[in-house]
C-alpha cells in the first residue's frame, strides 16, 4: 500500500517573490534540520524555463521503534528538481529522499501557480509515502511519516513566509 497526501497553501504575494524565496529559503529559523544545500545544475532550457537540481542534507528525530532499522543514522540526502516557467508564472518541484528508501520513500510534487484574481501564489502539493516493510509495520511507518511530514510542511510554510518577508524588507528598506 502507498499512502497519499495532498495539501494546498496560499501565499498572499506575487509569484516572483515566492519563487525567489523558494531558492533562498535556507537557512531560516524554522529549518534547523537542513544541514546543507548544494546546487548540482542550473540552466535555462529552449523554452525559457529555469531548470535546477539541488542536493540537500537533512537531519531528523526518529521514533525509537525505527532506530534499529537505521542503525543510528539520523541524516538523509534529498534530491530537489525544479522547473520555473516565468512566462506562465508557474514552478513545479519534485523532491525525494535518496537513501533509506527500503524503509521509507517520500516523494513530493508541488506546483506553484500565480492567481491574478487574488494576487496570490497557490502551492498545491501531492506527497507519496511508500514503505518497503511488510504489512505489520508498513502502515505504522507510513502513518508516522505522514504525521511528521504534516508538521514539517507547517514549518516549511512559515519558513517561506519568513524569507518572503526578509526579501521584501531588503527590497523596501524603512528609513
Curated annotation (Swiss-Prot):
| Alphabetical GO biological process terms | cardiolipin metabolic process; phospholipid translocation; phospholipid transport; positive regulation of phosphatidylcholine biosynthetic process
Give the membrane topology. Answer: Peripheral membrane protein
Subcellular location(s) of the protein: Mitochondrion inner membrane; Mitochondrion intermembrane space
Arranged from A to Z, the UniProt key words for this protein are:
Lipid transport, Lipid-binding, Membrane, Mitochondrion, Mitochondrion inner membrane, Transport
Q: Which residues cross the membrane?
A: none
Instruction: Write one Pfam family the protein is assigned to.
Output: PRELI
The consequence of residue 144 to E is: Failure to complement the mitochondrial defects of UPS1-deficient cells
The GO terms this record gives for MF are:
lipid binding; phosphatidic acid transfer activity
Q: Where is the PRELI/MSF1 domain?
A: 2-172
Q: Name where it mostly resides.
A: mitochondrion
Read off the InterPro entries from this record.
Answer: PRELI/MSF1_dom (IPR006797), Slowmo/Ups (IPR037365)
Q: What is the effect of changing residue 77 to D?
A: Impairs interaction with MDM35. Reduces ability to complement the mitochondrial defects of UPS1-deficient cells
> One GO term of the cellular component aspect?
mitochondrial intermembrane space
Q: Where is this region: Required for mitochondrial targeting?
A: 1-80
Q: What happens when the gene is disrupted?
A: Cells show slow growth, fragmented mitochondria and have a 50-fold reduced level of s-MGM1. These defects can be complemented by human PRELI or bypassed by growth on a nonfermentable carbon source.
Q: Which amino acid positions bind a 1,2-diacyl-sn-glycero-3-phosphate, per UniProt?
A: 26, 58, 148, 152
What this chain does, per the entry, is described as: Required for maintenance of normal mitochondrial morphology. Required for PCP1-dependent processing of MGM1. The UPS1:MDM35 complex mediates the transfer of phosphatidic acid (PA) between liposomes and probably functions as a PA transporter across the mitochondrion intermembrane space. Phosphatidic acid release requires dissociation of the UPS1:MDM35 complex. Phosphatidic acid import is required for cardiolipin (CL) synthesis in the mitochondrial inner membrane. With UPS2, controls the level of cardiolipin in mitochondria.
The UniProt family comment states: Belongs to the slowmo family.
Q: What else is known?
A: Present with 704 molecules/cell in log phase SD medium.
- Subunit architecture: Interacts with MDM35. Found associated with a 170 kDa complex.
Q: What is this protein called?
A: Protein UPS1, mitochondrial
Please name the source species: Saccharomyces cerevisiae (strain ATCC 204508 / S288c)
Gene that specifies this protein:
UPS1
Amino acid at each position: 500500500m502507498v499512502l497519499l497526501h495532498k495539501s494546498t497553501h496560499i501565499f498572499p504575494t506575487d509569484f516572483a517573490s515566492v519563487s525567489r524565496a523558494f531558492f533562498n529559503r535556507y537557512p531560516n529559523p524554522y529549518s534547523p534540520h537542513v544541514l546543507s544545500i548544494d546546487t548540482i545544475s542550473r540552466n535555462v532550457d529552449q523554452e525559457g524555463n529555469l531548470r535546477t537540481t539541488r542536493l540537500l542534507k537533512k537531519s531528523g528525530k526518529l521514533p525509537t521503534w525505527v532506530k534499529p532499522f537505521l542503525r543510528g543514522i539520523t541524516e538523509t540526502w534529498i534530491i530537489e528538481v525544479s522547473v520555473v516557467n516565468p512566462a506562465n508564472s508557474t514552478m513545479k518541484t519534485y523532491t525525494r529522499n535518496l537513501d533509506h528508501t527500503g524503509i521509507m520513500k517520500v516523494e513530493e510534487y508541488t506546483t506553484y501557480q500565480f492567481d491574478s484574481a487574488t494576487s496570490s501564489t497557490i502551492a498545491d502539493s501531492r506527497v507519496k509515502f511508500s514503505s518497503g516493510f511488510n504489512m505489520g509495520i508498513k502502515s505504522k511507518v507510513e502513518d508516522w511519516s505522514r504525521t511528521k511530514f504534516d508538521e514539517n510542511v507547517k514549518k516549511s510554510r512559515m519558513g517561506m513566509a519568513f524569507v518572503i518577508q526578509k526579501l521584501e524588507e531588503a527590497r523596501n528598506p524603512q528609513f
